[in-house]
Amino acid sequence: PLSQDHFGSAFSRYLSNNQVEYGVGFFAPAPSSLAVVHFSDAGQPEYSLYRQGIADRAIDASQQIAALPAQCKLLHLGSLALEPEDAPRIRAVLHAALARQIQLSVDINVRINAVSDVVQYRDFLREVVSLCQFIKASDEDLQLLYPQLSTSDALAALRATAPTALVALT
């Protein structure tokens, strides 16, 4: 869900102004998540991510499944949503979507500094990848997901995890 705070209200207005239906049906009292980006001297982005006690995690699987539109054909998720503590809920939603013939898409966008357990996060992200028909990954994502492998071997490992998926490498 979106938060009742200023960010959640602004995002809700943006969705409404762009004819996007907010299907959850409630706004959470918890705050919006926050990402702060800083650029290093080398011009590389560095992230500070605030993901604990936030609105978008204040939902259960039945509420998320009920919010899927009847005509939904594709469910996209980003890896910031894949906190290992939320794995049972997310797993239930993904399997319910697949049971309804909804295709799954993930931007793996690996951010290991934003999760409670890096090993569980990587394992769960690989599990999610195995369910998806569409996957977006960068070379940096692959190196973070498979730190012991070269980029080409990491891509091969990703392809082996989801052999029929369409993969976009950026």
Regions found by a protein language model. Give the residues of each.
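A glycine-rich beta-to-alpha transition motif near the start of alpha/beta enzyme domains, typified by
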Residues: 1-34
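Ribokinase/PfkB-type carbohydrate-kinase core domain
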Residues: 14-16, 22-23, 44-170
